[in-house]
């Protein structure tokens, strides 16, 4: 099985703090000076809920039926792959290496996509795998529906010219490798959505913008909304990375006459302060991938920090004059951040914050949970770096589910002290904790149901992260 290892892993930095491997939140601006960045909260105008249809909000999510042990024993959808609406235009891709850490995250992407019956094709781009790792991964993925695929690439972590290593080189180079391969989309009007591997589906992703439930923040207005993603009109999630890249040596990075060098600070924030999911017409994504791969080593040369690849994407999009429609509703991640899908969560009544019933009761949800922060309420916690790599095995137990009234607790345990929460902070943290754990448990249960011999699967809820 994939990801053999200890049940629990509590791994931290020498200074006792867990590494964060994602942007510290929408509505934050990274300031150069520290290896992980110093972040200053920017006060942003409130989000706007677009007055449009709620098509698809009634979607039934099979994994969310998990409520007891053994879970969902009588739910047929937990013992077979679900059928999803066909869409030969839509491709969702995400970049990983072949570590156990990213193996379990990848499986979580596929199983939660299956749970919401995500249309289209989903592709894991796996870079730097050994031949043995490729064989092991492919053997498992051969049991998946044809709409779930893996594409292997060389390891791009070291830049051939500079000799410098950067984990996230794999992201643009891997995307370009896939787009140049025989596995690339065949439809001339295909839409490609680039995700992160630490995404869990709460509802299906669609490229039909106005048929979705949309959130956006000023300066974006209702007049900026488009019917759907099309050539020349990409869409992405708002990230608070701001306009810092305009202060880089843009002419060195993108060329003397690059349009990127002429982008104003306000336009950089409005059109290019974005992150995953990036959603674009395949022709646009090909051009972006090429420029992104060309620019990222030069950006990293000037800015050798975590966000280099995101800034390189912004410069590539600006260079190609492909302004992005910046939307807020695609994901939630940082409980204190503006510009995410939190208005959906803030409007939930208490009974639905930690309840699996929310989607079935017409409660609005973000598309993804982006679980890249440390979430804590009371004595409950979750961080992806503390998840054992053997989560998706027959032997591994499941997570203990937090109580459904967790949002009523307005404090968190920091070890040596308690930190008080506002009601909103408690509700957001509880939402992330309950739903990430429920989603991962449901995914692990379905993995066991599909892959383990009768009587050999461990359904006990024993894992608790703090």
Spans of features found by a protein language model:
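Helix-loop boundary elements of multi-pass alpha-helical membrane proteins
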Residues: 2-26
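N-terminal anchoring/stem segment of glycosyltransferases
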Residues: 21-170, 179-188, 445, 449-465
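Short catalytic/ligand-binding loop motif for oxyanion handling, primarily in non-cytosolic enzymes
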Residues: 102, 132-134, 159-160, 200-204, ...
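Short secondary-structure boundary/capping segments
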Residues: 108-110, 139-142, 207-218, 320-323, ...
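GT-A fold catalytic core of metal-dependent nucleotide-sugar glycosyltransferases
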Residues: 167-239
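E2/UBC-UEV (E2-variant) core
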Residues: 229-261
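Catalytic core and acceptor-binding pocket of nucleotide-sugar-dependent glycosyltransferases
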Residues: 248-360, 367
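C-terminal catalytic/acceptor-binding lobe
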Residues: 320-466
């Amino acid at each position: 099985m994939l990801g053999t290892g200890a049940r629990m892993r509590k791994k931290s930095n020498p200074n006792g703090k867990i590494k964060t491997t994602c942007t510290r939140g929408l509505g934050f601006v990274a300031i150069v000076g520290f290896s992980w960045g110093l972040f200053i909260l920017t006060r942003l105008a409130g989000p706007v809920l677009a007055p449009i249809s709620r098509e698809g909000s009634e979607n039934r999510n099979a994994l969310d039926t998990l409520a007891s042990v053994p879970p969902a024993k009588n739910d047929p959808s937990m013992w077979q792959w679900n059928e999803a609406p066909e869409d030969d235009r839509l491709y969702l891709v995400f970049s990983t290496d072949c570590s156990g850490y990213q193996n379990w995250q990848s499986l979580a992407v596929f199983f939660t996509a299956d749970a919401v019956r995500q249309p289209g094709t989903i592709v894991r781009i796996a870079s730097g795998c050994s031949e043995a790792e490729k064989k092991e991964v492919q053997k498992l993925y051969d049991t998946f529906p044809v709409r779930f695929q893996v594409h292997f690439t060389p390891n791009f972590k070291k830049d051939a010219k500079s000799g410098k290593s950067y984990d996230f080189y794999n992201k643009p180079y891997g995307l370009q490798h896939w787009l140049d391969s025989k596995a690339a989309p065949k439809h001339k009007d295909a839409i490609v959505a680039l995700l992160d591997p630490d995404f869990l589906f709460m509802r299906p992703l669609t490229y039909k913008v106005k048929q979705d439930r949309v959130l956006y923040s000023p300066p974006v207005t209702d007049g900026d909304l488009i019917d759907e993603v099309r050539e020349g009109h990409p869409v992405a999630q708002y990230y608070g990375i701001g306009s810092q890249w305009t202060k880089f040596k843009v002419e060195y990075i993108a060329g003397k006459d690059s349009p990127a060098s002429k982008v104003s600070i306000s336009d950089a924030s409005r059109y290019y302060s974005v992150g995953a999911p990036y959603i674009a017409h395949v022709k646009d994504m090909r051009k972006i991938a090429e420029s992104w791969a060309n620019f990222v080593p030069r950006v990293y040369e000037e800015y050798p920090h975590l966000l280099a690849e995101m800034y390189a994407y912004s410069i590539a999009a600006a260079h190609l004059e492909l302004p992005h429609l910046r939307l807020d509703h695609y994901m939630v991640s940082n409980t204190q951040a503006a510009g995410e899908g939190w208005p959906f969560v803030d409007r939930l009544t208490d009974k639905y914050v930690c309840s699996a019933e929310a989607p079935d009761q017409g409660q609005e949800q973000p598309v993804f949970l982006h679980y890249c922060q440390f979430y804590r309420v009371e004595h409950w916690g979750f961080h992806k770096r503390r998840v054992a790599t053997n989560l998706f095995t027959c032997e591994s137990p499941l997570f203990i589910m937090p109580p459904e009234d967790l949002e009523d607790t307005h404090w968190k345990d920091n070890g040596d002290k308690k930190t008080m929460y506002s009601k909103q902070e408690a509700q957001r943290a509880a939402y992330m904790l309950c739903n990430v754990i429920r989603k991962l448990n449901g995914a692990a249960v379905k993995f066991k149901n599909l892959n383990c011999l009768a009587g050999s699967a461990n359904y006990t809820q024993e894992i608790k992260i703090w």
